[in-house]
Curated annotation (Swiss-Prot):
Subunit-structure text: NDH-1 is composed of 14 different subunits. Subunits NuoB, C, D, E, F, and G constitute the peripheral sector of the complex.
Sorted UniProt keywords: Cell inner membrane, Cell membrane, Membrane, NAD, Quinone, Translocase, Transport, Ubiquinone
Localization, UniProt: Cell inner membrane
Assigned protein family: Belongs to the complex I 49 kDa subunit family.
Name this polypeptide is given: NADH-quinone oxidoreductase subunit D
Topology relative to the membrane: Peripheral membrane protein
Organism, scientific name: Xylella fastidiosa (strain 9a5c)
Length: 435
């Protein structure tokens, strides 16, 4: 409801003008707005340029993912997880398959655990590069988007090489991963866009295996991050737009259920990879970047520092995987499909494959909650089984939902232009918020 306050007495000669009432006005920010990051509709009550109240409206991307997952066998819903936070695909899969593994009582082989750890961090870098480019673009720094997508394209090639898809990989499976790392990387072919010395430079790191390619990437990525920081970190316009904007105190962040960078940017050292280690995070060395002021600038610095730490983890995983061959799927034929070679000359293997992917498998009755440290925060899957081949209940804990709930409390008192900066540092994706 519009608030009305009497205009202060003035010495204006126009009597009608002095009796005018000053009203707050309502502004619709999104859903068709380039800075809304999807389908966010934010109803802002404005007093001039100052935000008095913010009312986020969600649901425009609701697809009933939880109910869909409850209507299909356990192993047919992995693809739905990719489409929740569609910038952090494999991290979503990780939470879901871990929940299934807990109920069945199986554990992925060590090599598969290292592969999962490595791809979780590749996914984190993919997410943070997308965030960095889009947030900088929202605030007027277009060049950063072009720089960020240069490296992002290399990691998308890794996704495509391992799963056949650039985004929706469906690579993690209960009991391990879909397949081992390939021995070759796809190369660029000569075209109007790639030729001569540029083509040779692009293909130079693709001569060996995927691990060789990732090792080269991990060696060169810190210099690329330095380039991003050259463009932004000490840029006075960037600092004017982010320093002291969107300050979230530690107690406020915890009260709203914030996780991930939104919490660590306020100085709270909470990271599931350290506090509740899963996969092989207890076997790799990395640090947790923390903010001090809890503003947009601190959250920017935390994400940039996280990319450096993710790069460290990838490097350690690559070194381990190079010298430790082994299985990537548990030897439990309840969940593991037969090998492709055996299906070509063994009817039983063919039947096994057909039954596994058409009917799935029954999971022992019970309930569990499995969470991972996704790029945006704690992504969790609460799974209940009644002993059938379909989940009785699937509930997904999306970090963006809790973060968006705090929008009204955080943006009050700031200018309209600051709302764009704050929405950007929230790093919202409505696939997971609306589900």
């Amino acid at each position: 409801m519009n608030q009305i306050r009497q205009a202060p007495a003035t010495s204006a000669s126009n009597a009608t003008e002095s009796k005018q009432e000053i009203r707050n006005y309502t502004m619709n920010f999104g859903p068709q707005h380039p800075a809304a990051h999807g389908v966010l509709r934010l109803i802002l009550e404005m007093d001039g340029e100052t935000v008095v109240r913010a009312d986020p409206h969600i649901g425009l991307l609701h697809r009933g993912t939880e109910k869909l997952a409850e209507s299909k066998p356990f192993n047919q819903s992995i693809g739905y997880m990719d489409r929740l936070d569609y910038v952090s695909m494999m991290c979503n899969e990780h939470a879901y398959v871990r929940a299934i593994e807990t109920l069945i009582g199986i554990q992925a082989p060590e090599r598969a655990q290292y592969i999962r750890t490595m791809f979780d961090e590749i996914t984190r870098i993919l997410n943070h590069l997308m965030w960095l480019g889009s947030n900088a673009l929202d605030l007027g720094a277009m060049a950063v988007m072009l720089y960020a997508f240069r490296e992002r394209e290399e990691l998308m090639d890794v996704y495509e090489a391992i799963s056949g898809a650039r985004m929706h990989a469906a690579y993690y499976r209960p009991g391990g991963v879909y397949r081992d790392l390939p021995d070759t990387m796809p190369k660029y072919k000569q075209s109007r866009w790639h030729k001569g010395k540029a083509l040779k430079r692009l293909n130079a790191a693709r001569e060996g295996s995927m691990l060789d390619f990732l090792e080269h990437f991990a060696d060169t990525f810190p210099q690329r991050i330095d380039e991003y920081e050259t463009l932004l970190t000490d840029n006075r316009i960037w600092k004017q737009r982010t320093v002291g904007v969107g300050v979230i105190e530690p107690d406020v962040a915890k009260a709203w259920g914030m996780t991930g960078v939104m919490l660590r940017g306020s100085g709270v050292a909470w990271d599931l990879r350290k506090k509740q280690p899963y996969a092989k995070y207890d076997a790799v060395d990395f640090d947790i970047p923390l903010g001090t002021c809890g503003d947009c600038y601190d959250r920017y610095l935390c994400r940039v520092a996280e990319m450096r730490e993710s790069n460290r983890i990838i490097k350690q995983c690559v070194q381990w995987l190079k010298v430790n061959p082994g299985q990537v799927m548990v030897e439990n034929f309840k969940v593991a499909p037969p090998k492709r070679e055996s299906m070509k000359d063994d009817m039983e293997a063919l039947i096994h494959h057909f039954k596994l992917f058409s009917e799935g498998y029954c999971v022992p009755a019970g309930e569990t909650y499995s969470a991972v440290e996704a790029p945006k925060g704690e992504f969790g899957c609460y799974l209940i089984s009644d002993g059938a081949n379909k989940p009785f209940r699937v509930h997904l804990r999306a970090p963006g939902f809790a973060h968006l709930s705090s929008m009204d409390a955080v943006v009050r008192g700031y200018m309209l232009a600051d709302v764009v900066a704050m929405i950007g540092t929230y790093d919202l994706v409505f696939g997971e918020v609306d589900r």
